[in-house]
Swiss-Prot record:
Organism ancestry: Bacteria, Pseudomonadati, Campylobacterota, Epsilonproteobacteria, Campylobacterales
Gene this protein is translated from: queF
Name under which the protein is recorded: NADPH-dependent 7-cyano-7-deazaguanine reductase
Function: Catalyzes the NADPH-dependent reduction of 7-cyano-7-deazaguanine (preQ0) to 7-aminomethyl-7-deazaguanine (preQ1).
Record keyword NADP present: yes
Keyword field: Cytoplasm, NADP, Oxidoreductase, Queuosine biosynthesis
Catalytic activity: 7-aminomethyl-7-carbaguanine + 2 NADP(+) = 7-cyano-7-deazaguanine + 2 NADPH + 3 H(+)
Organism the protein comes from: Helicobacter acinonychis (strain Sheeba)
Amino acid sequence: MSSELNLKLLGTKTPYIFEYNKDLLEAFPNPNPNLDPLITLECKEFTSLCPITSQPDFGVVYIRYIPKDKMVESKSLKLYLFSYRNHGSFHESCINTILLDLVGLLEPKYLEVYGDFVSRGGIAIKPFVNYAIKEYQDFKEKRLLGAK
């Protein structure tokens, strides 16, 4: 079935890449494009490096989206998120890049990314960013107002 959907990673030996690589992301056709499910994906073991100190940063990344014609393949998403492991970038930049990469891949009706990072020096950073096509702008605004 993976070959029918043109998926390269699902069902194969996993090559773990720890340098940022958006080309790891894969999508498959949405089997129900007439429905509007809000899909939640959660990565509880997200890590990246502080671009100043090179110290590791840890957090949970939440991705919620309403698909249009394509859906993200979860193994490719896991490998993509793991590719941030040795990537030096601020939390906000990581979250923005994840959103842009997924929007570029999926062209969804709506997509949001929220990062809940472990505090450093007593400060917790929790960036939130969202995107919507024209017909979902009201939903986007309501979600933004309700962001944690």
